């Protein structure tokens, strides 16, 4: 967040008002859930009965990742047809789209999934070595500065790289300005250098690192810019003054916590609920034996890796005691499914879209009727996807 504010402060001095707000904090929260590992939740400390503290990992169903995957599959498939008015033009188009550099068939669905995870993304096209290149840029690497409602026609994309100079590391931040107005697309670059990670630093001559890039680059008389912003089609209730979209998982963090808490408990049920046999501690002590060669060695009368037998004090002259816990699997499964129904309904997919059977997670993507909630949500998301592909 400091870098975004740092950029905004520097740009304000140049008369450019960047929109930062709270959206980038939200993106980082959602990104950690999308990755499936949230600090202080999936990794936490626990105090044991003896007062010692141990680190514990909470298991996850990875629902944020699953949701973004499924929404991508609902709104974009390999059956989508992109064609121009002639067969020859269509072939030329696909030659560009599915070049080794662009690999649109593979990269666009992955990009779309990340858009759903972060709320926003941008495609940028440029020429490199005579080839048209598509850059798939995530929403946390762009800052809008010119927009009308949710239509963004001025933005900054961010890229960073590091150089080693002796014992020091030099952190470079490359800012690219994209602006489209009055049928003119302008692309301008700035370069900043810092010795501290996360800071913008001071502006340096862009040409020192990129001498072959024309700067600025102006395209006059164009109908569309060489960039397309895509955002989720849901209202931004976290930062209502921002033109950025919000992650589709943003309003469901509490549900993810509830699901993972129950799932972790469900999996622990099989570990903690295992059959145990209590024996006196003296019964598991080893002894000394003489082998065939006359050597004395220590032997254990119990397999140390055997978790069934548990040694306790105070059971002298008592028979072994068997404890067999009753597993609460059905209660856990029902509780998880109740949360999944609440979650899928909140996503606009309808209750019952997800179902956990104890072994795997089932998804009702096979048949979606035209009058279902999931179908209407699918159509809503398809609209923004079609718009960005059409402009591309």
Show where each model-derived region lies.
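Short amphipathic alpha-helical segments
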Residues: 89, 100, 104-108, 251, ...
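Extended, charged amphipathic alpha-helical segments
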Residues: 210-369
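Extended, regular secondary-structure scaffolds
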Residues: 117, 122-246
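Extended, helix-rich architectural segments
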Residues: 1-153
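Extended, non-catalytic structural segments that build the interaction scaffolds
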Residues: 26-58, 311-346, 362-385
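Intrinsically disordered, low-complexity boundary segments flanking structured domains
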Residues: 61-63, 106-113, 120, 129-131, ...
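Short secondary-structure junctions and interdomain/linker hinges
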Residues: 18, 36-37, 74, 78, ...
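A preference for well-ordered globular domain cores
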Residues: 390-392
